[in-house]
Swiss-Prot record:
Source organism of the structure: Campylobacter jejuni subsp. jejuni serotype O:2 (strain ATCC 700819 / NCTC 11168)
GO biological process, any: translation
Subunit structure: Part of the 50S ribosomal subunit.
Keywords: Metal-binding, Ribonucleoprotein, Ribosomal protein, RNA-binding, rRNA-binding, Zinc
Family as reported in the entry's similarity comment: Belongs to the bacterial ribosomal protein bL31 family. Type A subfamily.
SUPFAM superfamilies named among the record's database cross-references: L28p-like
Binding, Zn(2+): C16, C18, C36, C39
InterPro entries named in the record: Ribosomal_bL28/bL31-like_sf, Ribosomal_bL31, Ribosomal_bL31_A, Ribosomal_bL31_sf
Domain of life: Bacteria
NCBIfam families registered for this protein in UniProt: L31 (TIGR00105), PRK00019.1 (NF000612), PRK00528.1 (NF001809)
Gene Ontology CC: ribonucleoprotein complex; ribosome
Its job: Binds the 23S rRNA.
Protein name: Large ribosomal subunit protein bL31
Binding note for cofactor: Binds 1 zinc ion per subunit.
Amino acid sequence: MKKEIHPEYVECKVSCACGNTFTTKSNKAELRVDICSNCHPFFTGSEKIVDAAGRVEKFKKKYAMQ
């Protein structure tokens, strides 16, 4: 790699809107994010499961596609 053309790689403090903070490496010293693994529904287990099968059956019944 050529010297003095790459951005400086420093330790980065990441702050989430939920209050969670963690450190990683980046070319910026501080990052602010809206959602992280601490508050994302996929990781917390509070995700909603859509009952698509019921909707399909309702559509077929409504338009007599059985």
